[in-house]
UniProtKB/Swiss-Prot annotation:
Keyword Membrane applies: yes
Tissue/organ expression: Expressed in the heart, kidney, liver, pancreas, small intestine, ovary, testis, prostate and thymus. Expressed in all of the cancer cell lines tested.
Keyword Calcium tagged: no
Protein's organism: Homo sapiens
Subcellular location: Cytoplasm; Microsome membrane; Endoplasmic reticulum membrane
Annotated S-S bridges: none
Name of this chain's protein: Protein MOST-1
Entry GO CC: cytoplasm; endoplasmic reticulum membrane; nucleus
Keywords assigned: Cytoplasm, Endoplasmic reticulum, Membrane, Microsome
Subunit structure: Interacts with TSPO, IGHM and IGHD.
Function summary: May be involved in cell survival, proliferation and progression of cancer cells.
Biological processes, Gene Ontology terms: negative regulation of apoptotic process; positive regulation of cell population proliferation
Length: 99
């Protein structure tokens, strides 16, 4: 199996074994299911353990899902802490024409 940068949702029948934040958008990256790590309660299955689970457990449905990635808001206070100060304002005029 190939590698996938997304999290995996393991399902046995209709009951999901994975827990954690809501996941969406099934990842179709090829003809075979791709995966990295999944969570079962507080245990993390590594790639090797997950492959063993999939190979030894009939009826396991593997689907690769990823979390929605959102842009993080820019916080000026963090700029001050990381860059040693706020960026200088070049002009108070907008860069494009506003009507």
């Amino acid at each position: 199996m190939g590698e996938c940068p997304h999290l995996v949702d393991v399902r046995l029948g209709h009951r999901s074994l994975a827990t954690g934040p809501e996941q969406s958008d099934i990842c179709h990256t090829g003809s075979e299911a791709r995966w990295t790590t999944t969570w079962y309660g507080s245990l993390s299955f590594s790639r090797h353990k997950y492959k063993m689970l999939a190979d030894l457990t009939p009826g396991v449905e593997m689907s690769c899902r990823h979390w929605a990635r959102w842009l993080t808001p820019v916080i000026p206070a963090l700029w001050k802490a990381e860059a040693g100060g706020l960026p200088e304002l070049r002009s108070s005029r907008p860069a494009w024409t506003t009507w």
